[in-house]
Structures are given as structure tokens and as C-alpha cells.
Amino acid sequence: MTIMAQVLHMDSSFPGKINPPVPPSLHAKDQEAPYSVETPYGYRLDLDFLKYVNDIEKGNTIKKVPVQRRPRYGSLPRGYGYTGSWWTSTESLCSNASMDSRHSSYSYCAPGFHTSQRPNFSTARVEKTLMDARRKLEEEKDGRRFSNLGSMHSSMAGSNTSLSSAHSFNRAQGGGSYTPMSSGLSTPVSPTPAHLQHVREQMAVALRKIRELEEQVKTIPVLQVKISVLQEEKRQLSVQLKSQKFLGHTLGFNRSRPRGELYIDIPEEEAGNGAGAANKATGSLSPTTPGSLQDSGCEIEETVIVAGARPGAKREVRTVGVGPEAEERGYRQVGVGVREQDLGLLPETEALKTKVGLLEVQLRKTMQELQSAQQQVEAAQKERQTVCPQVDHAVRATSLGWQDQQGQAGAGLHTVVSFTKQPHQQRTVGIQVYTLEQPTVVGVGTLLRAQGCTHPAQLEASHRRYGESPAAGDSPHEFPIAISSKQVREVLRSEVSKSVPVTNQATPMETKCNQVTAVCQRLKEGEINQQPAEEAIQVDPANPASPQSNLRSIMKRKADGEPGSPYTKKNLQFLGVNGGYESTSSEESSSESSEDESDASEYHEATEKLPESATPQSLVSSCIPQLASETPATQTAQHSTAQIPTNHTPAAQTTSQSHTTDATTQQHVTQSPAAEADVQHCVSQSSVTTTPPPEGDVQCVFQGCNPPSTATSLEQNSVQLSSATQQSKATDSNVQPDLAQTDVSDFAAQQTTTQTQFTSAKPQQEASQSKTADLTAQKGATHSTDGSAKQDIAISSTTKPAADTATPPTNKQTDSLELSGGLMSALHILQKALSEPNAFSHQDARTAYTSVLQEWLRVSCHKAADTAVVKAHMDAFASISPQLLEFVINMADGNGNTALHYTVSHSNFPVVKLLLDTGLCNADKQNKAGYTAIMLTALAAFSSDSDLQTVLQLLRTGDVNAKASQAGQTALMLAVSHGRGDMVKALLACGAQVNLRDDDGSTALMCACEHGHVDIVRQLLSVPGCDATLTDNDGSTALSIALEASQNDIAVLLYAHLNFAKPPSPVSPKSPILGSSPPSSSELK
């Protein structure tokens, strides 16, 4: 009975279908069934037939079972009766005529349900009850059509359960299909319990299959709605793809895609929430769904309600929904594809990478072309410099060293001159030169050492014109000689010096310069007398050789040529005696080759800083060029001496270029014998003319002159070197640091074009001035009637001396300048706060501090600050207390800059001097960037010598070796990086250390190499203790940095400094090694 009581009767039409009204007579018949039960969907079913079947089964004869109840919808058990689900089918089971005849409006007969058994009902009551039940079911069906429509959205019992069952009921109603008459009604037989059990089992199987089919059919409306929604979305997407081709199209996808997902997820998300959730889903469909789809939404609502009770149905809905979800993802991917294509990020990146690669390739090609072009230019320059003289004889030079002469008090210089018949190469190992001259003259300089720093000597030799045929000579030693002078740079990489052949129309002979009696003693005492008929060496007694002297110079020059013969070519050869290097330069008859030669010998610089307490001393080195004739008359020649102390500074580089034109003119003057005699300053035996060289750098001493019939006189240039020194710091306000750096090689190279010939005997004075304000100045040489010359050197800035007027004049009226009352009040408050601990925690102290700081910076820190105003304020501060003065002048702004920082940065050195004169200024205070005022001087510009003195005072006040907090750089590194050669000299003079490293491990020398400052590299290398082998954090040395930066000149300097500091193997055991120091004055005693 419980099973049959669950049989439901569904509406036969879809919602919205108008059914005919039920006649009132049908309602009256409902009350005639006393034995009935209320089904879960609000239908009443007569129980007479059920009662009868139950009585037959149990053997009971109960006639009436009054069941009068209307079950509450909420209390109805889910799956009451069987398998946890209501039977929602309206189909009738007719698998067997003997079953308990549950009736519906549609008969579904599966082939497997038919059996061969016949019904055995024989009782008229059973037949009557069956017919009555069928009739009442039909009436109840018609009567509930309108009630179903009214209670569809308000009652669970009044809602339809399945679209498929209602549809099948409608068909069954139209066909009028009832239980066939062959069910056994004509032959009633009492059923057995086994038969009834069999019927129940068949019914259960049939119901199970029907439920499965219903579950599948229920998804049809949902799928229809989804298909409609997806079609609409497809249409919208197609329209959007056609109309929107750029970034705007993504908005359309974002609007339509979530709506489609809502439709798809209705059965999953809303099933367990009851009718309210289903109503929400229906409401979301209604705005975009046509009227027919709204009706379908009602079906969806009911389907959700039923499916909520069946997990299987819920799972099936998800499975079916996979298809539309995949399709939706397809649209989503299309949107992504369009977005990437429209943006075009990846292609643009690839295009940029391709362009970068092409540019890098082009850059490499361009760099290669540039390097090849530079190599070609260098090769062309070398070819222009290379003019190999075609002569048949050459000069051979070897070193015999310092040897003790028998009967002599000291060491002498042994020189042997010889000729060979065929051209031979020249190999110069030491300082002695074999040359073919009838009388050989050798200039010997002072052989002294100072502070262990040696300097190169210079040897200048020229040959007679080509074409003269010399006679054969006998020389016990002959070496091949390379007569080319083009390989200037290669000279530094080897120990072989290239020489130029010297030809002379003379008889072969070998002359040994033996008469050098007491040379060393006379050098020490400052006097060297000339020896007749031999080489004459003399030092002016008025200026004896100073112990601070540090250079020995040997320089020879031979200007040959018969009177009237055209001047062909001159070659200069320089041999470094002490510095361990050699350089060769040649000069053609044109100014172009002269300039090339001037650049070719700039390879090494040896400088020595003198102690500050030392007074300027002149270094004496006299060279006596003399070409003695074969006649006795010419062997006795008069002599005269002249001495000009020099200071070789970078100024020589400027002046040497200015004299290039003069040198060119001088070469043309030598075309005539008279002009040649004038240029060479040939002097008669009775009179001597001494000509001061330009800038007072070179002094020539002439030891007689040959008659014009035999040969022209040979002029010799003597290099005079002296280092400028500082005077006492405490006694002299014009203290000048030892900034004069001697550069012998540069000097020798520059003098080849400017000082080998002289066109006038007029005194000249040059004061070189450079843009970088080099701290050098030279005073003109004064010459006396007896031929002696003296020159005083002072270190000063290269700007005009008149620039001293740049200092603002002191205004006398400012002595009465009075400060405002507010400032004075703030000063007193500040003074009081200084004597109290934690006084600046009070507001009035902080206010006073701010006021004083603003006023002090306003007065002192701008570019046009007046020294008078600043001094008046400082006097006011000091009148209150020296402590307050010290506190105020060291005040710093928000960036950590003090007044000293600002004044140095603005190059307002008069105010800087005022601050430093107080003795209270903190020169080592760093700003927030980590720089001190001393470091800022690397950018300051000097306008006068007084500014220089102020800078020196600042350098002495603070720590010149302090490092910046950011990169660890020192003031010397900053000055080097900015190319401030004057500041480099000043810093070195004040004790700056050259080997300090920054945070990257770089030294000042590496900075100079990287930025290509050749002069500064020379200055740094000249400092004793400068280590060129240091490496930075990357393992790079100064030489490797110069090579990477294509600084070839610097690389040559470094190579020479590194390699020629090591002495080569000696030629003989007694001879000094090339590159080593000569005997000092103490050793010669």
C-alpha cells in the first residue's frame, strides 16, 4: 500500500498551456470516496482496490481503512517507499495482466515486461474497484489542471515534476490508451503471494528505468536554454569581432562571458538552495531571454527543485555542461589571441632585439675600421719620419764604463771614434759614443744623485751632409747598425738605440779622450777648466753643483757641411744615462717632421721633488762643443762659459709649438755659408758670443771656432735642470710648493725644433700660461757682458699676475657695521645653549640656531660674498665668544655643506682665507655626499697667485689623503680625473699619497690612464714610490687600463717606467749598467 500510495498524477501540459476547466460534477465525485489517500502532489486516490489487494495478500477482511490526512510538504520523506525518490511518472505499467493495476493516462509497455501469464481475477468487486479507480484518476487529473497552474510557484506539491512525464501524459490522453481488456478481467482468479511479489519486483524495475529516463529528459529544457544563450553569445561575439579590432573588444567578452557561465552553472550552484535560488536564476534569464525562453525558465526552476534531491541528476547536469563550458573557453581563447595580436608585444620585442643586434654588429665593424684607420695613420706617420740616409759609413758606439786613468785623480769618460768602410748598424749600450771627428768633444754634466731619483741624460748628435767620401778607418770592434730612426716607440721596448750615420771628409783616426784629470773633483768643487786641444769642461764657480742636483746630461750635436753646401738633415740621439731609457728622434728639413720628432721622444719623465727647506739651486751642466781642426792654430781655442738654470715644466710643451715656425725658418737660413755661420754662432778666437736660448732652458758654450776653410763650428746645447723648492711655511706667506717637475725627454724632444739653432742673440722671456692654470712661471734670463746667464724660477699660477686685484678691497666703513638686534639676540641665546647640555631641545634654542644659520649662509656662501661683511660678522661672533665663532663658521645646512664648502666651490678664495685664518675652521668635515672642502678644490678655478696660496693653506689645514664616504676617492684622484694638473702638483707637494686606492681598488695613476691625461701620468710616475704595478679589484693594472682606453702614449710611458727600471746585463764588469745611477758626489770623493 505504501508503494501504491506514492503513485502520482502529473499535469499533461507544459506550463503556460491553457487547459479546459474542470466540471463541477467532478469535484462532487471526490467526496464519494470514503477510502482514499492524499498523494504527495495533492491528489486523492481511492484505496478500495489497494485495500482489497492487501487483504488478499494478508488474508484479512478489513473493509475500510480510514486514512484522512494531508501530509505536510516539508514532512514528506525523501524517497518514501523506495530508492529514495518519489515516483514522478504518469505512465501505467502493463507488463503483466495480473499485476495490481496501477493506472495512469499513458501505458508504457516494455517488451521485457510482457509475460505469458493470464490474469486470474474472478471477483466482480475487484473488477469494479479497478474500473472505479481508473475513472477517479481521470477525473482527478482533469480537476487538478488549473490548480497546478495556480500553485506552480507557491507550493512544492502543486508543481510539476517532469517535462517528459507531462508530455507523455498528454499523448496518452489524446490516444485514450487504457489497460487492455486482455488483462484477465474476464477470468478472475485469486492471485497468489508469489505472483504479487513478482509484480512488485517488475514494478520496481520499471520504475527505476523510468526514473533514469526522466532524469535524462529533464535536462532537455536546460540544454535548450543553454543552446539559446550560447547562440546569442556567439552572435554578439561575432558582431564584436567585426566591429572591435583593438583593445576595446575585451570589454564585450567580459560582459557576455560571465552571463554564459551563469546559465551553465544553474543546476550545480542553485540546486541545493530550493525554489528561492531557482527563482534567482530565472530572474537572471528573463532580461535577455525571449518570451518562450521565459517559459522554459519555469521548467528550469522545477528541474532544479527535483534534481536537488538526487545526486545522480546533479552529477549528470555537470557532465552535460562540460560541452558548453569547453565552447565558452574557446571563445575566451579567441579573445586572448586577438589581444596578443593587437598589442604585438612579442613581435616588437623581437624586432627591437634584432635592431640592437644589427647596431652592435655595425658598431663592431665601425670600431674595427677605426682601429685599422688609426694603424694606417700611425704607419704613415712613421713612414714620413723614416728617411733612411743612404751612406756608406756608420757610427758605432759602445760603453767602456767608468775607468780609473793612470795618473788621474778620478774617473774619466772614455770615448773612441772610428769609421768603417761599409754601412754598419749601431748598437748603443752605454753612454760613450764612437764618432769620427778629428778632435772629439764630449760634454759632461754633473754626476750627482739626489734622493735616489735619477734623471735621463741627453745626447744630441748630428752628421755632416751626405755625399762626402770618408776614408777607411780601422776599428777593432765593428757591430752592425740600423741607420733608421723611424722606430721611435720600439726603442723603449729594447735596449738598442738606433743611431744615424755620421760622415765626414777626413782621415781615419781614433781619438781617445784621456785628459779628464780630476773631473769628478772639479765637478764637486764647481770648477772645470778647459783643456786646450781637447774637450773642455767648466762649471761656473759662482753656482756650484748643488747636492740636490739629480741629472747627468750628455748632449752632443754636430752641425756639419762645407761652406756653401746646402743643409741636408740633422738627427738627434738622446741616451738616458740614469733613467734607464733611450729615445731617438730625427728632424727633417720641414716643420712637419720636426713636429713628429717632437712627439716621438715623449716617453719618460724623471722628476724629483726637493725638500721644502731647500733653497732653489741651479744644476750645472756644461757641454763644450768644439770641432778642432788639424792645424795647431785651431787646437788652441778660447772658451767662455754660461750657465742658465732651468725648470722644465709643462709650459715647455706650449712654447715648443710656438717656436716650430722659427725652427723652420732657421733651417732655410742655413742654405748659405754666411747664414749657417750666423746660425751656428761661429766665434772667432778673439771674441766669444753667447746667445741665450729661448725660455732660458738650454745654454750653449762655444769652445773656439774652426776657420771657414776647414769646417764650421759645432754648437752644443746643455740642459740645465733645477727643481723649484718651497720656502719655510711659517716665515713666508708666499709659500710655494715644489711643483716644478722635470721632464727631460719632453724637453729634449721639444728643443730639437726650437733650440738647436738660434737666429738672434736677443734675450727672450717666456711666461707660459695654460687653461688648466699650471703652477709654473718663468722669469726672463738676464745676461751679463762676460756671457754668464742666470735665471730665477718661481712657482705661481699661470694666470696674469694682475689677477691679484680680484680680491675684493676691504671697505673701511664696514668696521662700524652693526648686526641687527634680532641676530644679536639669537647669538646670545645660541651662546647660552652651547654651555648647557641638551639645550637644543628647547624651542627658543632651535629657533636661534635656525636664524643664525640662515643669516650666516646668506652672508658668506654666495658667489659675490663680500669679505668685509663676512669679517664684520665673524668679529661679532668672536666678540661674544671664540666658542660661538667656531660653532657658527662650521655650521652645515641640510646637505651637510658648510661655508667652507660653498666658498671653495664658488672659488671665492678671499672668504676662504678669512675662514682659514681663524684657525677654527674644520677643513675635514664631510657633506652628505662624503666630500670635504679639500676635495672640492679639484674643481675650483684660480684667478691669482694669492688664490693659489689660499689653496695651499687649505691643503695644509686638512687631511689631503681623506677618502670620500661614497666611493672612497681622495682629493688627488678627483684632481686627476678632472685633469687638474696644477692641483695634482699642489696635492703632491702637500703630501698626497699616490698609491691610495678607492673602493674599486683604483689608484690616481689608473684614473689618469683611463682619462688620458699624459702630463699627469708623468707627474705621478715622477713621484718616488709610485707603484705602477698595482691592480684594482678587477685585476687591471695602469698599463692594461691605458691599453683598453687606446691611450698609446700613456702605455709607452708606463712600459718604459716598468721595464727600464730593471737594469740590463752589463757590457763589462767595471762599467756601470745602463739605467743605473751614476756615481754620486760622495762616491767620487
UniProtKB/Swiss-Prot annotation:
Keywords: ANK repeat, Apoptosis, Coiled coil, Cytoplasm, Methylation, Mitochondrion, Phosphoprotein, Repeat, Transcription, Transcription regulation
Signal peptide feature range: none
Gene Ontology biological process: apoptotic process; glomerular basement membrane development; negative regulation of actin filament polymerization; negative regulation of cell population proliferation; negative regulation of G1/S transition of mitotic cell cycle; negative regulation of intracellular estrogen receptor signaling pathway; negative regulation of transcription by RNA polymerase II; negative regulation of vitamin D receptor signaling pathway
Positions of ANK repeats: 895-925, 929-962, 967-996, 1000-1030, 1034-1063
Phosphoprotein as UniProt keyword: yes
GO CC aspect terms: cytoplasm; mitochondrion
Localisation: Cytoplasm; Mitochondrion
Protein name: KN motif and ankyrin repeat domain-containing protein 2
Species in which this protein is naturally found: Danio rerio (Zebrafish)
Lineage: Eukaryota, Metazoa, Chordata, Craniata, Vertebrata
Gene this chain is encoded by: kank2
